[in-house]
């Protein structure tokens, strides 16, 4: 099973200019390498059979005859291979010459796509030799003794996979053919190119490819000429680039004097999901040509023992790399802007935050402090309330108080033990029974205190609950589930931890830094059950519901891409290889889906809060789900997974 992945390759062979039979030998070698690696579709550079830099030799019948003969020999020599192959070759039709992409598989040519936009400026003179696809009248072409489909609007389809083709300059125009092809159904675009190197051009090219793949919500496979092309005036560095929906999946090294084979997988299931969800995608169909694209069917082989070569990020919510600082600051800016607007609109004089010494309340307090700074309001008007209860440990209590003081926030301590004991007497509950009533009473008592203090001080209660807790329903209904504005509702637990650590290392003084780092290292817990005999946290959330890094991974792929459970399991196996065994992944995947469906009623009445990332559970925006939906289909699929 390949879970919607199509293994593709961009090949950059060594060439000798005008030596067609040498060139097809190199092409065949790369085809066979790709076949051994399970590649299903492989693309070669523009005019790869002859070399791009033949120039006026393209007017020579000897070269054109040789190119056609070499093409037919290549098709025949590789008849036993299953992979669909796309090569560039000059072909004659209607007494004209076209710069063509020829598609073939298992000894048969499937179709021919001529280049549409022929550059004729500066170093490019393609109109000197070639005719644009727009000038052609015929829809077939003769190669050897056979006729084959020809046109710039050919699509190649196998099941849910639909491939479209454009050639080099086609990508660089305002409305590339790929834009039209994707609206006709193409989900992978192959670009056969011969793009010479200039200072700064590669960065622009990479950006162009990623942007086009994002605009088209498609995979994009780009193969450009490399070593062996004439260096009379130009240098070709050999670019193999594979992108998917704006993300760069794989790229070849440039300026190598060896052949290149760049392989990755395009996830057509997630692309289909994105197109279905983003209903704006098909608005451009009104501008399509009246004649529909011609579809050529082929069969893509699904190899046994499918393996994924593309990386799978185990922490898809957390930023990394060069954009780290910018991304973290952007997240805080969104949270601050949302809270600032609400405070101003409500004419609030204070903000009330319950501080437990845990990650979520810490992040909420940091956001509130930044908001008051942005509004030029004194931090002392923020009221940080610590409410020690039956399960509060010295570590979390001390961290809560130290953090509030170090940030210049007003500290208020309201113990809740006596109030809860009175409540237990009122409802006739035995306090030695540590059940759901025992736990939730504490959460609701704290929320009541926060709400009343906010009313008393003309303030807003700032919610602390995060996206992961909302997904799992790990919150007390009308307890910590409720607030007047929730700043963390779109932030998953793995990102909460990351943001707090980032602030500790970059934004605060040493005193606050030490406190924040200790909070990061504290086990995640609601602290509703008394501590153990040593005064340490006894109730650890991840022991009860599972590791948050797994749940955040499940959540991301379920909501962002609409992935089904068995695919999420497959991806998690790769992402967490060596960290969690298969049985553990399956166990917590089942827990995730069971709880996600059971706990929707809590998400149906969430407080307002800003959307930060692409995944959100707001019932007013991103996630509208009935509270009584049944999880049977999802859970039964998980049960069928073989470990």
Describe every region a protein language model picked out:
Residues 1-354, 370-379, 411:
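Enzyme catalytic cores with a strong preference for nitrogen-chemistry domains
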Residues 7, 15-18, 23, 159, ...:
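ATP/NTP-dependent adenylation/nucleotidyl-transfer catalytic domains that generate, transfer
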């Amino acid at each position: 099973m390949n879970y919607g992945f199509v293994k593709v390759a961009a090949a950059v062979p060594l060439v000798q200019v005008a030596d067609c039979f040498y060139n097809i030998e190199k092409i065949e070698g790369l085809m066979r390498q790709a076949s051994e690696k399970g590649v299903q579709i492989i693309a070669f550079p523009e005019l790869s059979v002859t070399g791009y830099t033949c120039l006026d030799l393209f007017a020579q019948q000897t070269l054109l005859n040789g190119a056609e003969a070499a093409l037919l020999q290549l098709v025949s020599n590789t008849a036993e291979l299953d992979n669909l192959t796309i090569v560039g070759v000059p072909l004659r039709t209607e007494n004209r010459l076209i710069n063509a992409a020829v598609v073939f598989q298992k000894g048969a040519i499937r179709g021919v796509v001529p280049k549409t936009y022929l550059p004729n400026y500066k170093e490019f003179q393609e109109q000197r030799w070639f005719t644009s696809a727009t000038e052609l009248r015929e829809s077939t072409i003769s190669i050897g003794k056979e006729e084959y489909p020809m046109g710039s609007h050919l699509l190649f389809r196998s099941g849910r996979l639909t491939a479209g083709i454009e050639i080099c300059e086609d990508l660089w125009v305002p409305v590339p053919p790929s834009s039209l092809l994707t609206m006709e159904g193409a989900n992978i675009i192959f670009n056969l190119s011969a793009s010479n190197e200039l200072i700064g051009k590669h960065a622009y090219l990479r950006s162009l490819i990623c942007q086009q793949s994002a605009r088209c919500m498609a995979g994009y496979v780009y193969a450009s000429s490399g070593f062996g092309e004439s260096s009379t005036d130009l240098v070709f560095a050999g670019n193999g680039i594979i992108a998917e929906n704006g993300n760069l999946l794989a790229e070849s090294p440039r300026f190598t004097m060896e052949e290149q084979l760049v392989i990755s997988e395009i996830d057509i299931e997630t692309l289909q999901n994105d197109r279905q969800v983003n209903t704006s995608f098909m608005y451009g169909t009104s501008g399509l040509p009246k004649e529909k694209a011609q579809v050529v069917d082929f069969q893509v082989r699904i190899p046994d023992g499918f393996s994924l070569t593309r990386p799978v990020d185990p922490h898809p919510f957390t930023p990394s790399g060069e954009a780290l600082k910018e991304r973290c600051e952007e997240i805080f800016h969104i949270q601050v802007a949302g809270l600032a607007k609400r405070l101003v609109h409500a004419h609030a004089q204070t903000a009330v935050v319950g501080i437990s010494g845990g990650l979520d309340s810490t992040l909420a307090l940091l956001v509130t402090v930044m908001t008051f700074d942005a509004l030029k309001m004194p931090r002392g008007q923020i009221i940080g309330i610590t409410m020690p209860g039956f399960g509060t440990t010295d570590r979390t209590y001390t961290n809560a108080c130290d953090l509030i003081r170090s940030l210049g926030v007003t500290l208020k301590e309201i113990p809740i033990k006596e109030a809860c004991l009175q409540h237990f007497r009122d409802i006739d509950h035995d306090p030695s029974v540590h059940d759901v009533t025992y736990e939730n009473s504490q959460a609701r008592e704290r929320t009541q205190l926060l709400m009343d203090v906010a009313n008393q001080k003309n303030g807003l209660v700032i919610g602390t609950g995060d996206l992961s807790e909302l997904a799992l329903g790990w919150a007390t209904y009308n307890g910590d589930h409720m607030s007047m504005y929730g700043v963390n509702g779109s932030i998953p637990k793995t990102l909460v931890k990351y943001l707090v650590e980032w602030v500790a290392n970059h934004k605060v003084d040493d005193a606050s830094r030490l406190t924040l780092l200790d909070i990061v290292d504290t086990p995640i817990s609601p602290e509703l059950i008394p501590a153990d005999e040593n005064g340490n946290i006894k109730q650890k959330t991840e022991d009860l519901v599972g590791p948050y890094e797994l749940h955040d991974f499940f959540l991301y792929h379920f909501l962002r891409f609409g992935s089904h459970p068995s695919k999420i399991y497959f991806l998690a196996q790769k992402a967490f290889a060596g960290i969690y065994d298969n049985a553990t992944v399956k166990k917590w995947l089942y827990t995730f889906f069971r709880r996600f469906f059971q706990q929707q009623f809590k998400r149906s009445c969430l407080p307002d809060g800003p959307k930060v990332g692409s995944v959100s559970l707001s019932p007013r925006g991103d996630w509208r789900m009935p509270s009584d939906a049944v999880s049977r289909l999802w859970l039964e699929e998980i049960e069928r997974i073989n470990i």
